[in-house]
Amino acid sequence: MERYRLPKTAFVRKGWEYDAVYRGGRRLHGVGFTIIYLLNSTENNRLGISVHRKLRGAVKRNRIKRIIRECFRLHRDIFPQKADIVFAVRPGFALSSPEQIRQAVGSLCGTPCGVCNEKA
């Protein structure tokens, strides 16, 4: 059985990479979270997740991160291509089901301006 994993190259890892996305990226605001993205020169898109510690409970924070990673892994085609994408989860975010995050991301990426289909 083959495992479908995201390689380490699929993640924003360094602090300066997050800073670059926060400073120069475009923002899409959802309910309880913001997607910030910045086009890059790599062949694939990369994911970064930022969950505020004011969202109480490490179990909740880790579950949110796990669900966002899984959504990114399964639906990479709805995100901007060749971009660094950071999910900034705000303290008021409440996750009732994994389907909720997929619908929220899908509704943001289905915006009329079509920013999620931009090509580098």
Curated annotation (Swiss-Prot):
SUPFAM superfamilies, sorted: Ribosomal protein S5 domain 2-like (SSF54211)
GO biological process, any: tRNA 5'-leader removal
Gene3D superfamilies: 3.30.230.10
GO molecular function, one term: tRNA binding
InterPro entries per record: Ribosomal_Su5_D2-typ_SF (IPR020568), Ribsml_uS5_D2-typ_fold_subgr (IPR014721), RNase_P (IPR000100), RNase_P_CS (IPR020539)
Gene Ontology cellular component annotations, sorted alphabetically: ribonuclease P complex
Enzyme Commission identifier(s): 3.1.26.5
UniProt keyword annotations, A-Z: Endonuclease, Hydrolase, Nuclease, RNA-binding, tRNA processing
Pfam families: Ribonuclease_P (PF00825)
Protein family (similarity comment): Belongs to the RnpA family.
Protein function: RNaseP catalyzes the removal of the 5'-leader sequence from pre-tRNA to produce the mature 5'-terminus. It can also cleave other RNA substrates such as 4.5S RNA. The protein component plays an auxiliary but essential role in vivo by binding to the 5'-leader sequence and broadening the substrate specificity of the ribozyme.
Subunit (UniProt): Consists of a catalytic RNA component (M1 or rnpB) and a protein subunit.
Entries under PANTHER family matching the protein: RIBONUCLEASE P PROTEIN COMPONENT
Protein known as: Ribonuclease P protein component
Native source species: Desulfotalea psychrophila (strain LSv54 / DSM 12343)
